[in-house]
Every structure is written in C-alpha cells, then in structure tokens.
C-alpha cells in the first residue's frame, strides 16, 4: 500500500521513474470488459499527471500523497507528522478470488485527512506466481483531496528534492 503512495510522489517529481515504480507496485489492470468501471493504466497515468503535475490550479493537487500521511490535513496545509506514516485498516470483508491471477485479494482502507470520509479503499492481491503483494485497484488515491485553504502554500520539495 505504501509503495503506491511512494511511487505517486516519485511520479510527481520524476515522471519517467515514477511511472516505472507504479507499474512495479500494481497489477496489469488494463480495461476489463467485465468490469466497465475499471480504468486502464494509461487513463490512470493521465489522471495522475493532471492531479500531481498539472498546471490547472483548480484541479492539480501536488500535495495529494501528503494527505495520506498521518497528521496531514487540509487545515495544516497537509504537513504530516514525522516519522512519515501511512495508516491502513483492513475492511471487514472476506478475501475475494481473482481467477485471472489465480489469487485472493483483500481490500483495505487507507486513512486520509484530505477527504470527508477520512479514508479511501485500496485493493491488494498476491498473485500465485509472485512473492510480492501488488496493489490491484486504488481509485480513491487518484481522486482529488480537498484543496489547500487560501492562506496555505505547498512546499514542492517537502519529500523529494
């Protein structure tokens, strides 16, 4: 779960490397005709580009990743506590089976101070042929957190210089 957020932050500063990191941390989730609500990786990358690197001041959220770190919220300008910590909670549901990957997956809540709900859903899977867990779906992470209040500014080099 944390690797996806780190990859998103790397993508914000260094898009070529960040995109490679995102591909390593997530599954091959190209458009599935049986799941029309699922976005392709190309569409996700386009969304992340607009959100993390975009020039539209009303849409871009360069502080998106910070909003998922403990202690960060809109009122404090998304300044997280140190050491940087990502908080997750397991959803109260059973494992589900994915026949394409011959694996079970589970969903978690990633806590955030950037949304009214206080959390977003992320789905993690361990493919049968891999020793690593991968993020299979993370739509909330690439939907906007609340914008900074008018008096707050964002330090673009907070995490990566």
Predicted regions and their residues:
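Core segments of small alpha/beta cavity-forming domains
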Residues: 1-67
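Detector for Asparagine
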Residues: 29, 34-35, 76, 92-94, ...
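Intrinsic-disorder/low-complexity coil detector
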Residues: 61, 79-82, 126, 138
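Acidic, glycine-rich flexible loop segments
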Residues: 63-117
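Short beta-strand edge/turn micro-motifs at domain boundaries
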Residues: 107-109, 114-161
């Amino acid at each position: 779960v944390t690797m996806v957020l780190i990859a998103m932050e790397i993508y914000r500063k260094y898009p070529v490397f960040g995109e490679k990191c995102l591909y390593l941390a997530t599954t091959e989730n190209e458009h599935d005709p049986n799941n029309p609500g699922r976005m392709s990786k190309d569409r996700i990358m386009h969304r992340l580009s607009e959100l993390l690197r975009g020039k539209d001041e009303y849409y871009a959220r360069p502080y998106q990743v910070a909003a998922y770190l403990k202690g960060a919220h809109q009122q404090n300008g998304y300044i997280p506590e140190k050491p940087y910590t990502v908080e997750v909670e397991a959803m109260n549901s059973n494992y589900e089976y994915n026949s394409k990957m011959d694996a079970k997956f589970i969903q978690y809540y990633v806590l955030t101070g950037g949304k009214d709900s206080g959390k977003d859903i992320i789905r993690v899977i361990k493919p049968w042929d891999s020793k690593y867990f991968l993020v299979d779906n993370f739509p909330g992470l690439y939907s906007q957190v609340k914008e900074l209040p008018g008096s707050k500014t964002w330090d673009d080099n907070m995490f990566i210089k």
